[in-house]
């Protein structure tokens, strides 16, 4: 077996060892993560328990037959202005000054303002990675005003002070929960998606910091509530880009962030959004969702830093820990047998099968090609890569299984396979001395 030409070409584009891409970073600001990858916005909620109030909340959000509504497409949606340290700044007069960040904003006469009633404005300084958001913004002839304003450092896990609003009723940033065309087109959305409900409880749950409820009523969802598309929802019949969005809704879910129409969610203004994507998303019923209890993810109520799935401690970047493997075998010459091995993803990055630089492979440590030369490769990826994960996505704290076949050499002896997980194009993960012995008597 020889490495395919595509692999050899990709090899020339390898990132330096240990390099990781910024979580959800945009092409316009590649050095700015949209929060660190171990932030709650990037937490997988796929395996969290269903919230006891799930059915009640959905019933009070329009019911199971209510359809999802993508509130974007064509000229509609949210726009972000990319700024720099050289962009002029100005002071803004706020209606809710006691809960707003009173700092200079890079808000100019050319800053896009949402034409809808909320009149949101979004600015990202790509030099500092500070995100500025305004609600009810107006340039007002050079004397700018807004209902409220908030500034978020996208490199940190900081939350608003408890009880403070932002440009959203939940006191959360808006832009990290907005769908962007570039991420959907890439095949990978790695964050929760912001959405709204018409009536909410007068309470909030982490990571939200503020409420704007219609009543003190536990049958209504609180701000910050997380919902996911059920795991048994079949995404197979949808177009490729729609599947990307639906997969994100299954893994990262929706986060309730404002009062508005039930099950409306937001995306970036971009003429490339397809009518098919918008149409297909509008067919998804609210009954395909369920609320989850995300409290187990919280480490500190005043921080967005989150635990991994199953409470596994996480290290920043790409990491793994051996968990278990099938038995060593005594095999006849030329015999082919099935094997499996499991590793826990103990890093903050999601392993994504099919995306170069994010796919986790089971490699032969040190790119050892001796087993291949002995004829031991049986349906391997290539000469020193044995297998990839059995599932498309393995989130932080989740368990990955690798299944593969080995052919026993034609000569007698004891043969050792030294194994190590690798993110090809990015980094080798920990060398834990994992190996297999194949005995040919």
Give residue ranges: language-model regions.
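Bacterial N-terminal signal peptides
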Residues: 7-17
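Short, surface-exposed polybasic-aromatic patches that bind anionic ligands, especially phosphate groups
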Residues: 24-313
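Low-complexity, acidic Ser/Thr/Pro/Gly-rich terminal tails and inter-domain linkers that flank the onset
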Residues: 310-332
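Short, solvent-exposed loop/turn segments enriched in Ser/Thr/Gly
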Residues: 333-340, 413-417
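Short acidic, flexible loop segments centered on an aromatic residue
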Residues: 346-382, 420-423
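Enriched for extracellular/lumenal, surface-exposed ectodomains of secreted and cell-surface proteins
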Residues: 390, 420-427
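Short proline/glycine- and polar residue-rich coil/turn motifs
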Residues: 390-399, 439-440
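Short, surface-exposed loop/turn segments at beta-strand-coil junctions that are enriched for proline
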Residues: 405-413
């Amino acid at each position: 077996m020889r490495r395919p030409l595509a692999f050899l070409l990709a090899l020339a584009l390898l990132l330096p060892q240990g390099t990781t891409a910024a979580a959800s970073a945009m092409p316009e600001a590649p050095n700015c993560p949209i929060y660190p990858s171990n932030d709650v916005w990037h937490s997988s909620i796929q395996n969290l328990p269903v919230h006891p109030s799930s059915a009640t909340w959905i019933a009070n959000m329009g019911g199971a037959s209510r359809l999802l509504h993508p509130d974007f497409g064509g000229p509609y949606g949210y726009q972000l202005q990319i700024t720099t340290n050289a962009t002029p700044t100005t002071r803004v007069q706020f209606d809710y000054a006691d809960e707003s960040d009173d700092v200079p904003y890079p808000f100019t006469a050319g800053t896009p303002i949402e034409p809808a009633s909320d009149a949101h404005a979004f600015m990202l300084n790509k030099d500092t990675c500070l995100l500025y958001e305004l609600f009810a913004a107006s340039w007002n002839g050079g004397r700018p005003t807004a209902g409220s304003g908030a500034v978020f450092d996208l490199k940190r896990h900081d939350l608003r002070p408890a009880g403070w609003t932002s440009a959203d009723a939940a006191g959360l940033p808006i832009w990290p929960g907005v769908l962007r065309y570039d991420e959907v087109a890439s095949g990978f959305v790695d964050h929760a998606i912001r959405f709204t409900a018409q009536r909410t409880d007068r309470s909030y749950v982490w990571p939200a910091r503020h409420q704007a409820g219609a009543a003190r009523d536990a049958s209504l969802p609180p701000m910050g509530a997380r919902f996911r598309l059920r795991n048994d929802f079949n995404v197979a019949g949808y177009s490729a880009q729609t599947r990307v969005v639906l997969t994100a809704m299954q893994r990262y879910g929706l986060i309730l962030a404002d009062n508005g129409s039930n099950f409306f969610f937001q995306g970036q203004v971009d003429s490339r959004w397809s009518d098919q994507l918008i149409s297909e998303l509008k067919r998804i019923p609210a009954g395909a969702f369920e609320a989850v209890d995300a409290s187990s993810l919280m480490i500190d109520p005043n921080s967005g830093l989150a635990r991994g799935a199953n409470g596994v401690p996480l290290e920043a970047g790409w990491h793994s820990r051996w968990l278990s493997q099938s038995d060593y075998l005594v095999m006849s010459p030329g015999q082919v047998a099935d094997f499996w091995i499991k590793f826990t993803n103990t890093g903050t990055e999601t392993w994504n099968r099919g995306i170069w630089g994010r796919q986790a492979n089971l490699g032969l440590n040190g790119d050892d090609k001796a087993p291949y030369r002995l004829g031991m490769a049986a349906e391997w990826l290539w000469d020193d890569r044995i297998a990839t994960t059995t599932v498309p996505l393995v989130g932080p704290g989740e368990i990955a299984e690798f299944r593969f076949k080995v052919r026993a050499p034609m000569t007698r002896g004891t043969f050792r396979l030294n194994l190590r997980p690798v993110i090809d194009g990015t980094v080798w993960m920990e060398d834990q001395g994992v190996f297999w012995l194949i005995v040919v008597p």
